[in-house]
């Protein structure tokens, strides 16, 4: 999952 990466640009991380 991209949310697990150091730099996250996914909607699930941004809110």
Swiss-Prot record:
One of its GO terms (molecular function) is toxin activity. Expressed by the venom duct. The keyword Glycoprotein does not apply. Its main location: secreted. Keywords: Disulfide bond, Hydroxylation, Secreted, Toxin. The modification 4-hydroxyproline is found at residue 11. GO terms for cellular component: extracellular region. It comes from the Eukaryota. Belongs to the conotoxin M superfamily. The cysteine framework is III (CC-C-C-CC). This is Conotoxin Reg12d. The lineage of its organism: Eukaryota, Metazoa, Spiralia, Lophotrochozoa, Mollusca.
């Amino acid at each position: 999952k991209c949310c697990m990466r150091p730099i996250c640009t996914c909607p699930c991380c941004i809110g």
